[in-house]
């Protein structure tokens, strides 16, 4: 393409025409052009330094028109408002926000709104005399949470808020004693989020909070905050890390005193808190929540003392286990949340404990019993202000039906021979002879040995092989082809029953199963059985790290996972775990403390469960396991039962107790049923069903009693009874009359309809014996039974 240039652009071409335009620069040489260019640039630089002031408007004409225009333009601007006085802001800094109307953070009149505080109503005259900056507003729970709270949870949030804000008395602490599965975590998340965001004074009530829990639940708390708040708040979860990292992180949390903290909630375990209490106790904290708070029943331990040193007045204690009638422990719990509410320990003993205990004695006088009753009522009146308790009977409206069964399995011939030989040995005789009022360590070891033998002979094979005292000739009882590391279910009645039931479940359903034991050695046998039958499984015990526990639980609960078995140590994961991926649970051996068993068995029948649940408690017929079950069932006083593994066992067993434990009831279907002296059964056959108002929380005497597989609610157990021929007796009951569709807490429609349908409080009381002095407290119901 040809390009044409203008004449001025063609510098290298001589223009011959005289009439043509010639630029001035073309007539000069190169040096002259450069000088001309520098001259022009210098003039331009000088011109930029000159500031020319605008000339005033001048009118040269003298006409009236020009004068009128000049007068208008010279006049100053005036705001066209009558009597307007301009305010030039001489006393006000630039950028100050104008005062705004004080209002609640959320609409108190919205549908399903949960209002925790309602300000007093003022007349217009009273409002004019009040300072507008001090008018109180409504405190309304975030609709994100109020729309998923069930009626009993709304009541619990309101109760805790009134306690921590001092609305129920001159105290700021409370005990949330709801049973497992009622959503204590969600209620605490709601309370914490509300206090961090608002108050009646239009500002946050607290700036920081600490949640202290067992180490296995720290990650679970973080997940719950994220789940319910949808990531609107970040928590500081202390999981692992070096000492230097932990110290630096906690110091940063402690030094942050701003009202809008980036991570306002610290999630920490009891052990970590105790180690770093010197850092956390330096700063003020808005509120502390203690999960599994029954750990604080001993006021002398270091963890209790460390938490008491925390600078906070708002204390919330969570405990899913019933508060039992050890008055000293009970005082420790109440004194932690509300110091001085019951006075000092000496005052409490003088004012309440001594009088109540004297009234319980069999030889107490009428005056002492009357005084004990008065003191009990006085104590009830005090503690009911700060304790709320509801039973899991409330869950029957939201969860599928739960079938609970106590299965008595016969010992095999091998187990029976070893068991009876040991009871007849000199070892047991010496244990009984050495026992006066306290149990010897030898007797405790013998008790553990018998419990392990009831599970499987493999668990005591080392004693058999070493021919220890009591087992001198027992190794000869084992089969000739016996191999200790190769599981043989036929050597144990409970394992044989478990093997049959797992096979039937695997073949006939897509159900998942949780296996729980108090011994990790039993978990080893579970693993051997799973590998032998080619079942996929996961295992959680005390050796697993906290981070890995969360991954294992998530994998098992995943509906797409093919994991069939979840093996769990009750000591490591009996509290707080949510295993709703399974709907069948085997409690393979009983614990001395019924609360531990209840915690472990509550892992599957929880919020989010959509299938009917089957809970199996296996005990060896006539053995020491039935003795343990009887202690749980009859709920004897704490002087003759073991409450937890932190207490020494020897103070609980007398010589008569040991004689009962070291006895075996042969040729009985169930020693427990015999001792119940059941009037509804004749010759071990039930003639009359339980009352209609009973369920699986009732006493065993009010359950269904089966000496054969007819009438069992579970076809799997019925088939296994016939196939294994090792079941002798079954107690069973259900949670409610009929199964109902499961409803999760995110089902907003059901929550709305339920709240409209029922406006009254839903409270349930414990169905305890008179001699089991369990506190059954709620905001609307007093407990009784000291």
From Swiss-Prot:
Domain of life: Eukaryota
Record keywords, A-Z: ATP-binding, Cell cycle, Cell division, DNA damage, DNA repair, DNA-binding, Helicase, Hydrolase, Meiosis, Mitosis, Nucleotide-binding, Nucleus, Phosphoprotein
Residue positions, PTM Phosphothreonine: 22
GO cellular component, one term: nucleus
Pfam assignment, any one: Rad54_N
Enzyme Commission code(s) on record: 3.6.4.-
Disulfide bonds: none
Any one GO molecular-function label of the UniProt entry: ATP-dependent chromatin remodeler activity
Gene Ontology biological process terms in this record: cell division; chromatin remodeling; DNA synthesis involved in double-strand break repair via homologous recombination; double-strand break repair via homologous recombination; double-strand break repair via synthesis-dependent strand annealing; meiotic DNA repair synthesis; oocyte fate determination; oogenesis
Boundaries of every Helicase C-terminal domain copy: 497-654
Main enzyme class: hydrolase
Positions of the UniProt region annotated as Required for chromatin remodeling, strand pairing activities and coupling of ATPase activity: 2-9
UniProt motif DEGH box: location: 291-294
Compositional bias (Polar residues): 776-786
Localization per record: Nucleus
Disordered: annotated span: 738-786
InterPro entries per record: Helicase_ATP-bd, Helicase_C-like, P-loop_NTPase, Rad54_N, SNF2-like_sf, SNF2/RAD54-like_C, SNF2_N, SNF2_RAD54_helicase_repair
Binding-site list for ATP: 178-185
Limits of the Helicase ATP-binding domain: 165-340
Protein family per UniProt: Belongs to the SNF2/RAD54 helicase family.
Biological role stated in the UniProt entry: Involved in mitotic DNA repair and meiotic recombination. Functions in the recombinational DNA repair pathway. Essential for interhomolog gene conversion (GC), but may have a less important role in intersister GC than spn-A/Rad51. In the presence of DNA, spn-A/Rad51 enhances the ATPase activity of okr/Rad54.
Assembly behavior: Interacts (via N-terminus) with spn-A/Rad51.
PANTHER family associated with the record: DNA EXCISION REPAIR PROTEIN ERCC-6-RELATED, SNF2/RAD54 FAMILY MEMBER
Name the record gives this protein: DNA repair and recombination protein RAD54-like
Species for this entry: Drosophila grimshawi
């Amino acid at each position: 393409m040809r390009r044409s240039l203008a004449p001025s652009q063609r510098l290298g071409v001589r223009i011959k025409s005289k009439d043509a335009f010639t630029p001035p620069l073309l007539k000069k040489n190169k040096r002259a052009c450069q000088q001309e260019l520098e001259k022009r640039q210098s003039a331009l630089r000088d011109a930029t330094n000159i500031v020319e002031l605008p000339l005033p408007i001048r009118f040269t004409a003298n006409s009236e028109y020009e004068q009128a225009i000049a007068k208008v333009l010279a006049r100053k601007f005036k705001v066209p408002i009558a009597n307007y006085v301009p305010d030039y802001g001489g006393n006000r800094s630039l950028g100050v926000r104008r005062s705004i109307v004080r209002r609640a953070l959320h609409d108190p009149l919205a549908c399903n709104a949960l209002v925790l505080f309602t300000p007093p109503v003022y007349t217009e005259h009273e409002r004019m005399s009040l300072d507008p900056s001090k008018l109180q507003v409504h405190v309304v729970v975030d609709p994100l949470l109020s729309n998923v709270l069930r009626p009993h949870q709304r009541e619990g949030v309101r109760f805790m808020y009134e306690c921590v804000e001092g609305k129920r008395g001159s105290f700021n602490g409370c005990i949330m004693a709801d049973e497992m599965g009622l959503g204590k975590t969600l209620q605490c998340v709601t309370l914490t989020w509300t206090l961090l965001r608002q108050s009646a004074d239009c500002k946050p009530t607290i700036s920081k909070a600490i949640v202290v829990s067992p180490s296995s639940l720290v990650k679970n708390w973080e997940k719950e905050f994220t789940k319910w708040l949808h990531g609107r708040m970040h928590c500081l979860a202390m999981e692992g890390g070096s000492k230097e990292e932990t110290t630096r992180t906690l110091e940063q949390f402690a030094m942050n005193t701003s009202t809008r903290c980036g991570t306002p909630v610290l999630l920490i375990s009891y052990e970590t808190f105790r180690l770093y209490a010197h850092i956390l106790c330096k700063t003020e904290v808005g509120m502390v929540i203690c999960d599994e708070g029954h750990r604080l029943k001993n006021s002398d331990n270091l963890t209790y003392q460390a938490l008491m040193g925390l600078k906070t007045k708002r204390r919330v204690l969570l405990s899913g286990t019933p508060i039992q009638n050890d008055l000293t422990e009970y005082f420790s719990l109440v004194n932690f949340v509300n110091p001085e509410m019951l006075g000092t320990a000496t005052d409490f003993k003088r004012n309440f404990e001594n009088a109540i205990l004297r009234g319980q004695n069999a030889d107490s006088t009428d005056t002492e019993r009357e005084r004990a009753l008065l003191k009990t009522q006085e104590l009830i009146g005090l503690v009911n202000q700060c304790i709320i308790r509801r039973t899991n009977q409330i869950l029957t409206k939201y969860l599928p039906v739960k079938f609970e069964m106590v299965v008595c399995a016969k010992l095999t011939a091998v187990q029976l021979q070893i068991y009876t030989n040991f009871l007849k040995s000199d070892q047991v005789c010496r244990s009984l002879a050495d026992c006066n009022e306290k149990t010897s360590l030898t007797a405790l070891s013998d008790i553990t040995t018998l419990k392990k033998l009831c599970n499987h002979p493999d668990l005591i094979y080392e004693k058999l092989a070493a021919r220890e005292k009591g087992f001198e000739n027992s190794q000869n009882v084992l089969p000739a082809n016996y191999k200790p590391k190769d599981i043989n279910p036929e050597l144990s009645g409970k394992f044989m029953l478990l093997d049959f039931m797992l096979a039937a479940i695997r073949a006939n359903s897509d159900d998942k199963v949780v296996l729980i034991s108090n011994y990790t050695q039993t978990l080893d046998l579970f693993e051997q059985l799973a590998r032998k039958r080619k079942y996929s499984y996961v295992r959680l015990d005390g050796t697993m790290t906290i981070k890995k526990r969360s991954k294992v639980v998530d994998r098992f609960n995943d509906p797409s996972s093919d994991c069939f078995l979840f093996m769990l140590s009750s000591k490591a994961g009996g509290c707080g775990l949510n295993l709703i991926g399974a709907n069948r649970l085997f409690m393979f051996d009983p614990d001395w403390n019924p609360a531990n068993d209840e915690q472990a068995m509550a892992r599957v029948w929880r919020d989010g469960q959509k299938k009917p649940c089957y809970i199996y408690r296996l005990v060896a017929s006539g053995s020491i396991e039935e003795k343990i079950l009887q202690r749980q069932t009859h709920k004897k006083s704490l002087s003759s039962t073991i409450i937890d593994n932190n207490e020494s066992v020897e103070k609980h067993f007398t010589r008569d107790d040991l004689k009962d434990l070291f006895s075996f009831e042969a040729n009985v279907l169930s020693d427990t049923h015999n001792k119940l002296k059941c009037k509804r059964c004749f010759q071990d056959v039930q003639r009359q069903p339980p009352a209609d108002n009973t369920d699986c929380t009732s006493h065993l005497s009010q359950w269904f009693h089966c000496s054969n597989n007819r009438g069992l609610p579970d076809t799997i157990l019925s088939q296994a009874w016939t196939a294994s021929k090792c079941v002798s007796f079954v107690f069973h009951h259900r949670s409610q009359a009929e199964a109902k569709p499961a409803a999760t807490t995110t089902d907003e429609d059901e929550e709305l309809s339920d709240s409209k349908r029922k406006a009254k409080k839903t409270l349930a009381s414990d169905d305890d014996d008179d001699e089991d002095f369990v506190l059954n407290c709620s905001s609307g119901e007093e407990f009784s039974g000291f």
